[in-house]
From Swiss-Prot:
Protein name per its UniProtKB record: Chromatin modification-related protein EAF1
GO CC annotations on file: NuA4 histone acetyltransferase complex; nucleus
SUPFAM superfamilies (UniProt xref): Homeodomain-like (SSF46689)
Main location: nucleus
Any one GO biological process: DNA repair
Domain named HSA: residues: 202-280
Length: 686
C-alpha cells in the first residue's frame, strides 16, 4: 500500500474518531488492524461503524458545555502534556457538603440502625425515593403569573432541554385551566364531579362517518349474550361430568384407606420453613389491623416486569395507624366555622328593650346545642325553650326568660371572646351588624342595659322571682293598654261612620262600580260643552255692558221735551270693607249669580214635570195588565215571554200619556189598528 492510500485511510479513521472535528490536533487511531478493517469489511459493517461513531459523538456534544476555542486548545495541550493530576481543594466550611457526601452519610446512618427499625423496599428505578411537594392549583397559578418559564427561557445561559419547554407549556395549560375553573365557579357551573359529555348517536356517527348505528350495537350485544348462554350450558354440563366422575371414583376406591394428614417429619427443610411461616387462624384478639385502602394484589410485583429496581431504606413506624394532619375532601374539620346570624328584630324602641337573664346552666346548654346543631338557631331556641328554668309558670314566659333565636345568638357572641363582625356570613349578616351597633349606642347613651345579663345562682335566689312577677305585671299592663286603644279606635271609627251616614242621607251616593255607557258619556260631554259655551257668551255680554256703562258719556238733554227725572247713578259693587271690586271679581260675581238663577230655574222645571207626571200617571189594576198581556200573546204567538212583557209595558205607557185607561172589554177592531199596532210588530221591531 502506498503512502497516498495510507494517508486517506488515516483521514477516514480521524472522521470515525471525531465526526464533528472538535479535535484540533487531528488525532487518529494507530491501530493498523482497525484501519485495514475498513477496506476488508463489507459495506454494511463499515456503514454501521460510522453510524455508531456519529451517534456517540452527538450524545457527548449534547451534554458537553459550550467551551471557548482558546480554552479547549489549552485543555487539550494540558492533556497531551500528561502532567501530574491536579489536587482537589476541599472546603474548610463544615456546613458546605457535596451531594456525594450527603448520600454517603445517609447510607452510613441507615446501616448503623438495627434491622427491626428499618423498612427495606425495592422501588422501580424510574420512581423517586421522596415524594415531591404537592402544590395547590392556586399557588401554581400564582407562580405561572409571577415567574413564568416561557419568559425565562429566552434569556437562559444554559443548555435547554425538551423538559424545560414541556414544563413551560404545562404552566400555560395550568393558567388557562385555573382561569376557566374560576370562571365556572363564579357562574355556579363547577362541581367536584364532571359528568361525561353526551353525544347524540346520529350526529356523532354522521360527523365521524361511521356506518354502525345503535341498532347494530344492540344486535352485536345480543350475539354476545347468545354465546354467553351457550357457553354457560356447556359449563354446566362439564360440572355435571366432573361431579359424576368424582362419585364414581369415590365408590371405586372406598375400600382403600388414605392418610388425611401430613407428617411434618417427612417433609423437606424448605417445606418445614414454609409451614412454620404460615399464619395461624385463632379467635379474635385485641390487636386489630386496619385493612389497607388498596387491594393486596396491587402490592405484588408483576411476573413479567424486567425493569431494574433500586433498594430504598426507610425508618419503621411502630404505630399501626399513621396519624396525619391532612384531611380528605369530605373531612369533618374546616378552616373556620361560618357564623350565620338569624333575622334580627326591628330596631324600633330598642332603648326600651328588657335584657334577658341567663343562668350558668343555660350558658352550658347553649354552648352544647350550638356545637350539636351547628348554628341552627331555630333548633337551638326550641331545645332551650323546652328545657327552660321556669317550671312553675308553664303558660307564661316573661321577657327575661324568653329564648328567641336572636337572643340565643346575642348571648353566644357575648360568651365568645374572639367574636368579630367579619365572622358573620349569610343573608342577615349586615342587618345583624347594624342592630348590634345601634344597641351598643343606645346602651351607652341611655345608661340602660340592653344586652343579655349572666347571673349566678346566688343572684337568682334573691331577685329572680321579683323580676319575674314584675315582668308579668308589666306584660298585663301593656296588654290592657293595647285593648283600650283598640276599643277607642273602633268606637271612634263607628261614630265617624254614623256621622257621615247622617250627613249623606239626602245625597244618594252614585254607584261608583257602574261603568257609564258611550251614550251617557256623549250626553255628559254635550252638556258640559253647552254650559261652557253659554258661560262664555254671558261673560262677553256682561263685559260689553259694563264697558258701555263706564266709558259712554251721558247724552245731551233735548230742548223740546221736558227733561226726564235724573237716573240713579250706577254704584260699583264693593266688598264689605268698602273696597271697590276689580273687573275680574265683578265678572266672577255675575257668573255666580247667573249660575244660581239657572239652578233655580232647573229645580222649578223639574218640580213642574214631576207634578205633571203625577197628574197624568194612571194606575192600572193587575187584572187589566194580565188581560193586555194575554191579548198580545194571542195576537203574536211567536213572541217570548220577555218580549210580550216589554210590548205590554210600552202599550200601557202610551195609554197613560194619552190620558185614558185600558177598556174593560176586548179591544175593538177599529181601535186595534190604532192602539195595538206597536204590539203587533215583529220581535225585531220590538
Amino acid at each position: 500500500m502506498n503512502d497516498t492510500w495510507r494517508s486517506r485511510l488515516k483521514e477516514i479513521s480521524h472522521i470515525t474518531a471525531d465526526p464533528f472535528l472538535r479535535d484540533f490536533h487531528k488525532l487518529h487511531t494507530n491501530d493498523k488492524e482497525q484501519i485495514y478493517s475498513i477496506l476488508h469489511n463489507p459495506d454494511n459493517v463499515v456503514e454501521q461503524t460510522f453510524k455508531n461513531t456519529i451517534i456517540k459523538s452527538m450524545e457527548e456534544s449534547m451534554f458537553r458545555p459550550l467551551i471557548p476555542t482558546q480554552q479547549m486548545k489549552r485543555r487539550q495541550n494540558d492533556h497531551h502534556n500528561q502532567g501530574p493530576p491536579p489536587k482537589v481543594q476541599k472546603s474548610t466550611v463544615d456546613s458546605l457538603k457535596s451531594q456525594h457526601q450527603i448520600d454517603q452519610q445517609n447510607l452510613d446512618w441507615f446501616l448503623s440502625q438495627p434491622l427491626e427499625d428499618l423498612e427495606v423496599m425495592t422501588v422501580p428505578e424510574q420512581y423517586p425515593l421522596t415524594v415531591p411537594a404537592v402544590l395547590p392549583l392556586a399557588e401554581l397559578y400564582y407562580l405561572t403569573q409571577t415567574l413564568a418559564s416561557i419568559k425565562l427561557l429566552p434569556g437562559s445561559h444554559k443548555v435547554l432541554m425538551t423538559e424545560n419547554f414541556e414544563s413551560a407549556l404545562a404552566e400555560g395549560k395550568i393558567a388557562v385551566l385555573y382561569s376557566r375553573i374560576e370562571e365556572l365557579k363564579r357562574q355556579g357551573k363547577w362541581s367536584l364531579r364532571q359528568p361525561q359529555k353526551f353525544y347524540d348517536p346520529f350526529k356523532f356517527i354522521r360527523k365521524s362517518k361511521k356506518k354502525s348505528f345503535h341498532w347494530d350495537y344492540l344486535l352485536q350485544e345480543g350475539k354476545w349474550m347468545a354465546d354467553d348462554f351457550r357457553e354457560s350450558s356447556k359449563y354446566k354440563k362439564w360440572c355435571c361430568v366432573v361431579i359424576a366422575e368424582a362419585v364414581e371414583q369415590y365408590w371405586k376406591g372406598r375400600k382403600v384407606s388414605h392418610q388425611t394428614f401430613v407428617d411434618v417429619a417427612d417433609l423437606k427443610k424448605i417445606d418445614k420453613s414454609i409451614i412454620r411461616n404460615l399464619p395461624v387462624y385463632t379467635g379474635l384478639g385485641g390487636d386489630s389491623r386496619e385493612p389497607p385502602i388498596a387491594t393486596v394484589s396491587k402490592l405484588v410485583y408483576p411476573a413479567e416486569d424486567n425493569h431494574w429496581y433500586k433498594i430504598a431504606l426507610k425508618p419503621h413506624h411502630h404505630h399501626h395507624r399513621h396519624q396525619t394532619t391532612h384531611q380528605g375532601l369530605f373531612g369533618s374539620t374546616r378552616k373556620y366555622n361560618t357564623l350565620k346570624p338569624p333575622k334580627p328584630p326591628t330596631p324600633k324602641n330598642i332603648e326600651y328593650r328588657i335584657p334577658t337573664i341567663w343562668l350558668p346552666e343555660d350558658d352550658k346548654r347553649l354552648i352544647h346545642y350550638v356545637a350539636e346543631f351547628c348554628f341552627n338557631w331555630d333548633l337551638i331556641s326550641e331545645h332551650i325553650s323546652s328545657s327552660s328554668t321556669a317550671v312553675s309558670l308553664k303558660k307564661y314566659e316573661s321577657n327575661i326568660e324568653r329564648r328567641t333565636p336572636w337572643q340565643c345568638f346575642e348571648r353566644y357572641i357575648q360568651l365568645n371572646d374572639k367574636f368579630q363582625f367579619s365572622d358573620m356570613k349569610g343573608v342577615y349578616a349586615y342587618h345583624a351588624q347594624q342592630w348590634l351597633e345601634q344597641a351598643h349606642r343606645a346602651q351607652s347613651t341611655t345608661k340602660r342595659r340592653i344586652s343579655p345579663l349572666g347571673v349566678g345562682p346566688e343572684s337568682v335566689q334573691r331577685g329572680n322571682r321579683k323580676l319575674r312577677w314584675a315582668s308579668m305585671f308589666d306584660a298585663m299592663r301593656k296588654a290592657m293598654k293595647k285593648r283600650e286603644i283598640a276599643a277607642a279606635k273602633v268606637n271612634h271609627r263607628k261614630s265617624t261612620a254614623e256621622l257621615q251616614a247622617n250627613q249623606n242621607v239626602t245625597e244618594p251616593k252614585p254607584n261608583s262600580d257602574r261603568i257609564p255607557t258611550p251614550a251617557e258619556l256623549s250626553r255628559l260631554k254635550f252638556e258640559r260643552d253647552k254650559t261652557l259655551h253659554e258661560n262664555h257668551i254671558n261673560q262677553q255680554a256682561t263685559r260689553a255692558r259694563m264697558v258701555q256703562a263706564v266709558a259712554k258719556p251721558a247724552p245731551a238733554p233735548a230742548p223740546a221735551p221736558p227733561p226726564p227725572p235724573p237716573p240713579k247713578p250706577v254704584k260699583r259693587p264693593t266688598t264689605p270693607n268698602g273696597t271697590p271690586l276689580t273687573n275680574e271679581q265683578i265678572q266672577h260675581l255675575l257668573q255666580m249669580q247667573k249660575h244660581r238663577r239657572m239652578l233655580q230655574q232647573q229645580q222649578q222645571q223639574q218640580q213642574q214635570q214631576q207634578h205633571q207626571q203625577q197628574q197624568r200617571r194612571i194606575h192600572f189594576p193587575p187584572a187589566q195588565v194580565s188581560k193586555v198581556i194575554n191579548d198580545i200573546q194571542q195576537q203574536n204567538p211567536g213572541l217570548s215571554k220577555d218580549q210580550v212583557t216589554k210590548l205590554a209595558a210600552q202599550y200601557l205607557a202610551s195609554l197613560s200619556q194619552q190620558g185614558y185607561g185600558v177598556p174593560s172589554s176586548p179591544v175593538p177592531p177599529h181601535q186595534k189598528n190604532q192602539t195595538a199596532s206597536p204590539m203587533s210588530g215583529s220581535p225585531n221591531n220590538a
